[in-house]
Amino acid sequence: MSIDFKDISVVIQGPVQAYQGRSQEPGITHKCIASIRTHLPGATIILSTWEGQDCHGLNPDILLLNKDPGATIVSYNAKGEPGKLNFNRQIVSSAEGLKQVTTPYAVKIRSDNFLTSNDFVAAQQAFPARNDASKLFTQKVVTNTSYFRRYADGQKIVMLPSDFFHFGLTEDLLKIWDIPLFPDREFDPTKAGSPQYRGAPKVGPHAEQIYCNAWLRKLDSTVPYLQHRHQNSPELLAYWERFIASNLVVLEPEQIGLGLIQRFIPKSKRPNEICHQDWLLLYKQYCDPSIAISKFDIFKTIGWKRMCKLPFSYIKHQLTQIKK
């Protein structure tokens, strides 16, 4: 079944100007909108941003000026100074935009990314096999390998998908983004003088892990609360890999047709990130044994780099923990 572009809405979420803590390439949101008009003619464009943002010259079909929830306090350092991340800004701009969608399919894209093709539309249905016991989405959701990490500090980790780009059924994207806002972390005076954050004194989860853990626990009550970055077990890793194979289609940016601004483009593929071949191997293992992919195929591209770099990353992390 082919998907007609008129059955797709594109939610562009985030700021269209720089603000404190978030730089912005001038004119990038104009470029994003123009690229959608070029590569998805007939699709509905929804720009979901903040009150006070200068949207002059932008021409989305729907413009949402959300009330800015502000940055979220997620930590305190030893001096009691708060650390903030844009958790709720991303949730509000994504979820409120998706709630305006009336088409069966939707794209969620950052306001500082853009399209270079529409290849992701066909790719969404190119891998139909599922592991029935692991299905949490109605259909597959296409996502991006950039910042989709399989390793951190030389160790395999779980629940760290990229949040740059999603394409799939609107109902499935809402499963990811329509989650409760995160409350500010309250300062605990009994822990004054020590860092306070989720998982302390172990290494805290990455922001993407915290997002993913929240929506995955909403979909499946058996998923544990992720206390720290490296929390893992053979059972949890297998669960995460089955989920990836059965519910996602993980593609390189060029396979999606996703354009990234310069600061997101590495000089070479990062060994700690998933690659499309990694995902294909999981898809073969859990969904479709007929897929032609092997571990040696991965070794020839990114595997040998991992063998060289990951052990050093692990040793460096262990030494850092000892110094603490």
What are these regions (language model features)?
Residues S48-Q100:
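Active-site-proximal specificity loops/subdomain of glycosyltransferases
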Residues D7-I12, I36, T44-L47:
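Hydrophobic targeting segments
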Residues A106:
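Short aromatic/hydrophobic "clamp" motif used to bind/position activated sugar donors
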Residues I109-R110:
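Active-site acidic Asp-centered loop
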Residues M1-H30:
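N-proximal low-complexity "stem/linker" segments adjacent to membrane-targeting elements
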Residues I28-A43:
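Short, acidic, metal-binding catalytic loop of nucleotide-sugar glycosyltransferases
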